[in-house]
A protein has these predicted regions:
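Residue-level signal for secondary-structure boundary elements
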Residues: 19, 79, 105-109, 113
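Mid-chain, well-packed structural core segment of small domains
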Residues: 43-74
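Surface-exposed interaction/gating patches
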Residues: 1-7, 108-113, 117
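N-terminal, charge-rich interaction modules
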Residues: 1-36
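Gly/Ser/Thr-rich loops at beta-strand to alpha-helix junctions
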Residues: 1-3, 60-63, 88-92
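A polyampholytic, Gly/Pro-enriched intrinsically disordered region
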Residues: 38-46, 99-111
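Basic helix-extension-helix modules of the SAP/HeH family
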Residues: 31, 57, 97-100
Length: 118
């Protein structure tokens, strides 16, 4: 949609390659989806999820902040579930990464709510 087009434009400005992931690819490891290893023969049969996720891989120092700052300047709504490729999450599939990021996001959101209540 429109948000994806804006994200592509932001990425092009910084010479970042964007790769959308289709539901059929959710069984692949995050490393394979990021091009860090070969894809495996694996069919995804799960229910999937609707939340958008953003995984950043091979970003030089400071690039993530520059990229996300460009989101703000271009009026692109934040992506709540985002991660850098790490040795830990590289072996996960999309569903496992989604589960972990959604849990972290809920914990942060709940934590902020509690802090404001006093």
């Amino acid at each position: 949609g429109e948000k994806m087009q804006k994200i592509r434009l932001a990425a092009m400005r910084l010479k970042i390659r964007i790769r959308p992931v289709e539901k059929a690819e959710y069984a692949q490891t995050i490393a394979a989806l990021c091009g860090a290893e070969d894809a495996r023969e694996a069919a995804y049969t799960g229910a999937g999820f609707e939340d958008e996720m953003l995984v950043m891989a091979n970003f030089p120092a400071g690039m993530m902040n520059t990229f996300l700052g460009l989101f703000r300047r271009m009026g692109i709504a934040p992506v709540a579930l985002k991660a850098m490729l790490t040795p830990t999450n590289a072996a996960w599939d999309s569903e496992k990464l989604h589960e972990e990021l959604a849990g972290e996001h809920r914990a942060m959101t709940n934590g902020e709510g509690k802090r404001h209540q006093g």
